[in-house]
């Protein structure tokens, strides 16, 4: 009986120790939760400017467009804007020519849903390509 009481007291002491340890950990967690990770507005604006300037540099490198290609693009844009205003309207194409894109689309839909002519259709599809 005396042994049981001493073991019981040890268990109570162990429970109290673990409770106090958990409480210390909770206080540390609560202190971290209350901390604000926000920096000053000036610092965040500088970081934002830095990230935008880095993105601009990555999007358009210095040697992406040569001078000749830039002139070509400007000339093409100008011709697409000016020529429709200057040239007379063209007559409509023949009716049969208008059916060509529709025929191509119908052919592609038929080919997409057509079953394959593979003799052994029970095998795994991926093993045929590997």
From Swiss-Prot:
Belongs to the plant organ size related (OSR) protein family. This is Protein AUXIN-REGULATED GENE INVOLVED IN ORGAN SIZE. The keyword Transmembrane applies. Induction: By auxin and ethylene (1-aminocyclopropane-1-carboxylic acid (ACC)). The chain crosses the membrane at residues 70-90, 94-114. Promotes cell proliferation-dependent organ growth. Takes part in the AXR1-dependent auxin signaling pathway that requires ANT during organogenesis. It is found in: Membrane; Nucleus; Cytoplasm; Endoplasmic reticulum. The OSR domain is sufficient to promote organ growth. Residues 65-116 are annotated as: Organ Size Related (OSR) domain. Keywords: Cytoplasm, Developmental protein, Endoplasmic reticulum, Membrane, Nucleus, Transmembrane, Transmembrane helix. It is a multi-pass membrane protein. Mostly expressed in flowers, inflorescence stems, leaf primordia and young leaves, and, to a lower extent, in siliques, cotyledon vascular bundles, roots (pericycle and root tips) and mature leaves. Coiled coil: none annotated. InterPro entries: ARGOS/ARL/OSR1. It comes from Arabidopsis thaliana (Mouse-ear cress).
């Amino acid at each position: 009986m005396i042994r049981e009481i001493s073991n019981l007291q040890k268990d109570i002491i162990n429970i109290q120790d673990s409770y106090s340890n958990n409480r210390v950990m909770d206080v540390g967690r609560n202190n971290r939760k209350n901390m604000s990770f926000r920096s000053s507005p000036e610092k965040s604006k500088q970081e934002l400017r830095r990230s935008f300037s880095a993105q601009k540099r990555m999007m358009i490198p210095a040697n992406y467009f040569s001078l000749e290609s830039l002139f070509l693009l400007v000339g093409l844009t100008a011709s697409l804007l000016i020529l429709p205003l200057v040239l007379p309207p063209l007559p409509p194409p023949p009716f049969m020519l208008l059916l060509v894109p529709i025929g191509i689309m119908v052919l592609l839909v038929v080919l997409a849903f057509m079953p394959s002519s593979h003799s052994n259709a029970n095998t795994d599809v991926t093993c045929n390509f590997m």
